[in-house]
Amino acid sequence: MRAAAVQLNSNEDKERNLGIAERLVREAAADGAELVVLPEKFNVLGSSEQLAAGAEPLDGPTLRWAESLARELRLWLVAGSIVETVEQDEKLRNTSALIGPDGSIHAVYRKIHLFDVEVGEMVYRESDVEGPGDEIVVADAGELKLGLAVCYDLRFPELFRIMAVR
């Protein structure tokens, strides 16, 4: 399976970000990609307030856009991550979705390991606005087994060992 990683400099303008992402996904598909992976928070990136303003449920406009694009281009699409609202929880989630060529969501992963660190005088506390996921996700993407992870999850090798065993 030919795969492509799409990179873009997202900001708080969701419409702009989706336009750029769509152009890049289409370019990857034209180059033969059967699996395209979008980056973390590809649809909206900014301050905590901007993330909250751009957050949406799984059935919101960003994943509907991704489902439509995957269906049209007949490819697997990892919607890198979006900022997800969760019913009855004030905390947001950093959520990745695997969408199939049929345009349906085949797997959903919510980032488990939140980035709460102090680097010199800088303090990062994702847990102030985001809640952790609690499920390790490995899904079928055609003949490929695909483990989903987001950003800081990379620092926890046990997550990937578990995925490999599955």
Annotate each language-model stretch with its function.
Residues M1-A4:
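Extreme N-terminal starter segment of soluble prokaryotic enzymes
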Residues V6, A55-E56, A149-Y152:
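Glycine- and other small-residue-rich loops at beta-strand/loop junctions that grip anionic moieties
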Residues K14, R23-D102, H106-R110:
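Cys-nucleophile CN-hydrolase/nitrilase-fold catalytic domain and related Cys-dependent amidase chemistry
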Residues R16, L58-P61, E130-G131, R155:
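Short secondary-structure boundary/capping elements
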Residues R16-V25, F156-I162:
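Short, acidic/polar
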Residues S68, E87-R166:
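Active-site catalytic loop in hydrolytic enzyme cores
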